[in-house]
Design a protein with these regions (language model features):
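Catalytic core segments in nucleotide and nucleic-acid processing enzymes
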Residues: 134-256
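Terminal, charged accessory segments of proteins
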Residues: 1-137
Length: 256
C-alpha cells in the first residue's frame, strides 16, 4: 500500500506529515492530526481542545486507546453476577462483542452497558482496531479539504458555500461563482509544480460556469503569498487563477 497521501498511525508506527510552517515538532503534528480527524470522525467522537493538546504528547496509538476508554461508561467492566440488577440497560449485543474483543477476546468478563453511550465507543473501535491491531489512516487531502470547507463556511455566512466533493463552490447573488480546489501539497514559490492543477482550472474556466478558480494549499515558510497564474490562451477572457496559501496555525493557537 502506498502511504504517500495518508496520515495517522499503524500500530506504533506514526505517519505524520512532513514538518511545515510552524508545525515543526512531533507534538504539533500529532495535535494537527487529532484536530483534523474530527472532520472524519464527527459522527463517532470528537477530540476537544484539552484532549488535542494533551493527547498530542503521547503516541497516536495511545491517544486513541485513551479516547476509547473515555467513551465507555464507568461500569464497563462489571461482571454479570455483580452488576446492579435494579438498573435498566438497553443491551447492544453487536457493540458489546466489539468491545469485548477489543479488550480481551479470551476474558470471561461481559460488558453491561447503556447502548446509547456504548455505540460511539464500539464505532471508534471498529474504525481503528483492525485485525486485533490499532490502526487509523486517513487521506490527508480529504482532511485538508474538510478543514478549508469549514473555514469558508464560517467566513462566508452570507454566501452559499457548497461542497462539490472534488472542489468547493462559493456563490453570491449577481456575482459569478468562485470555484476552489484544495490539495495538501508543499509548494515552493519559485517552482510550485502545479501544472496539472492549473490545466484543470483552465478547462473549468473554458466551460464558462466559473471565471475564478483558486488552488488552495497549506501555507509554508516559502509559500506565504498568493501566486497569480497568467494563461496566454485565456488572455481575451475575464478570468482569475490563483494559488493561495491557507494557514493551519489556528489549530495550534486554539489549543494553547
Amino acid at each position: 500500500m502506498d502511504f504517500t497521501n495518508f496520515v495517522g498511525f499503524d500500530g506504533k508506527k506514526e505517519l505524520l506529515p512532513c514538518g511545515f510552517d510552524t508545525f515543526d515538532s512531533e507534538v504539533k503534528l500529532r495535535q494537527l492530526f487529532l484536530h483534523l480527524s474530527n472532520f472524519v470522525l464527527n459522527s463517532i467522537c470528537h477530540f476537544n481542545k484539552y484532549e488535542q493538546k494533551n493527547f498530542a504528547k503521547i503516541p497516536l496509538k495511545n491517544a486513541f486507546e485513551s479516547k476509547i476508554k473515555s467513551l465507555l461508561p464507568l461500569h464497563k467492566l462489571n461482571r454479570l453476577n455483580n452488576f446492579d440488577k435494579n438498573r435498566k440497560f438497553n443491551l447492544c449485543s453487536s457493540s458489546t462483542r466489539i468491545i469485548n474483543n477489543y479488550y480481551n477476546p479470551k476474558t470471561s468478563q461481559r460488558l453491561i452497558v447503556n447502548s446509547k453511550k456504548l455505540i460511539p465507543a464500539a464505532k471508534l473501535i471498529s474504525h481503528c482496531f483492525i485485525n486485533n491491531k490499532m490502526q487509523l489512516l486517513m487521506d490527508k487531502n480529504l482532511l485538508f479539504h474538510e478543514f478549508v470547507l469549514e473555514k469558508l463556511r464560517k467566513l462566508h455566512k452570507d454566501k452559499e458555500v457548497l461542497d462539490l466533493g472534488d472542489s468547493i463552490s462559493i456563490k453570491q447573488k449577481d456575482v459569478c461563482a468562485l470555484k476552489i480546489y484544495t490539495s495538501w501539497k508543499n509548494i515552493q514559490r519559485k517552482d510550485p509544480n502545479i501544472e496539472k492543477e492549473v490545466n484543470h482550472a483552465i478547462n473549468v474556466i473554458k466551460e464558462g460556469d466559473y471565471n475564478q478558480v483558486y488552488l488552495i494549499y497549506p501555507k509554508d515558510n516559502d509559500f506565504t503569498r498568493h501566486i497569480p497564474v497568467y494563461v496566454e490562451e485565456l488572455k481575451y477572457k475575464t478570468y482569475q487563477i490563483k494559488a493561495i496559501p491557507y494557514s493551519l496555525r489556528s489549530i495550534i493557537r486554539k489549543n494553547i
